[in-house]
Amino acid sequence: METGRQRIGDRLLRNTLFNAGGRLWLIGTNLLLTPLYLSYLGQDRFATWVLFWTLTQYLIFLDMGLGPSLVKHFAEFQAKGDAQSINQAVTTVCCLYLLMGASLLVALWPVMGWIAARFSLTPDLLQEAVQTFRGGLIVLVVLYFVNLFDALLKGHQRMDLTNLALVTVSVPNVLGSYWVLRQGWGLAGLVVAVCGVYLLQLLLLVLFARRVVPQLRLGRRYVRVSMVRDLFGYGARLQTSRVAELICFHADKVLLGLFVPIRYVTFYDLGAKVSYFLHDLPYIFFNAVFPAASELASRDDHQRLWLLYERGTKYLLLLSLPILFGTWLTAHLILQAWLGHVSADVRRAILFLSTGYWTSISVGMVATVGAGIGWVSTQMRAGLLQSVLNLGCSTGLILAMGYQGALIGTLTALLCGNAYLLLRFCRDFDRSVAGHLKLMLRVSLVNAPPALLSLGYLLWVAGWLPEGDRGAALLAFVGCVGLYVPAYLAAIRWSGILDRVDCELLGDYVPMLHSLLRAPA
């Protein structure tokens, strides 16, 4: 019979692989769409499109954390086989989202003109921006329901279906965006295309949810006002840390749009897109860990929960640090292959933001396991600290230094907020801060030989790489990756950082993992 450890491990690895496939596909489509948007819209309209998404992301957070709260509660209901509570949660939240959506449309539609006028937009672009931002309110309502059924499937640990829906709708997203831009419909056409894509995604998620939960029903008899308190109580506390994340990733775009020429929003966003690759890939793992941690916590299985935390932290650092070092080394190649030119402002954003984003990744298992077991009050305080620092530092530094001030302010806030979170977690759960830092240092040293080898290669490449040649830059980038990866794997084996426990946990899933174990002396 399959043991509990095997079931958790199998689901965790399966969901990680599905998340990896879905996110890599989505990253690829975003990288494809960005040069397309830039070529048709230009820098200023592209910046307006960035602000459209930034404002939409902020408004999504007005749900007071229902999204992540639902994942936790659905995971617990599923573990208990409680279909009645699932129906009550889905129906109650549907009613809440309808009420919230209608309220936001009525309240914000008239003031979008005032909001758009606050940004450094040219007069001929202002009215177009107003219509674009108003379209974002309609997209927002659809997104609320997408997030609801996405949470239902994630709570049942069916990341295969959520990612299938994501990949499926990405095709009409790319084709639709290209078509409306070719027709000359500009930002208005993109808003219509995005709304249609999210409606299609919602339809797919509902169909998948009915298959996973055949007992799923909606009806007035399932509305439970008493459930709202539990959902909001957990979600509101967790939401503070998520708002802090949103501020660190998006507030600078708003501040830049307010205080400096609008083109700097474009430069910042392009740098953030490259840096977000570092942030996004490890979060593939977190999305799979969160419901698994909730399930283990509901069973009081603390031994496997802490094994998940300790080993997960090591695997996370082994994955994220080479991506960070690789991003530092190859930022110029990435930009030349992607956009056809290297902008000093965009490259500077990549260096600062990738470092800041990595600080969040380095404590990612702290935040994810903590949220899974209900440890959210401290995350709320860390989020508040990070938010205040980010807004204060970025605003002051932008006024004093311009564009670079936003980069320095965000990096400072991320370093301080995540350091506080790690210290409090280790204190509350009797974990070792020194052990965490030693592991970070050890993995960094493992990366030193491949990083130095790659640096020598890049210095050699710089002597012959033609400026503006995308193909040559891509070839040089692939060559650097081809040099770094085998050198890194050899360094892992030589260092002995992986042990027999790792082989027992992952040996059935990762081909030839045993070859990375150091041979006994």
What is the predicted role of each segment?
Residues 1-12, 187, 205-249, 288, ...:
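Interhelical loop/hinge segments that connect adjacent transmembrane helices in multipass membrane
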Residues 1-31, 84-92, 126-130, 205, ...:
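N-terminal membrane topogenesis motif
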Residues 1-6, 431-433, 455-521:
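Membrane-proximal transmembrane or re-entrant/amphipathic helices at the cytosolic face
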Residues 8-76, 102-109, 139, 169, ...:
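Signature of the first transmembrane helix
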Residues 12, 141-166, 188, 354-386:
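Membrane-interface junctions at transmembrane-helix termini in multi-pass inner-membrane proteins
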Residues 14-31, 169, 193-201, 205, ...:
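Transmembrane helical elements of multi-pass membrane transporters/channels
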Residues 64-80, 94, 155, 213-217, ...:
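Helix-loop junctions and terminal segments of transmembrane helices
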Residues 134, 163-212, 234, 275, ...:
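Hydrophobic alpha-helical transmembrane segments
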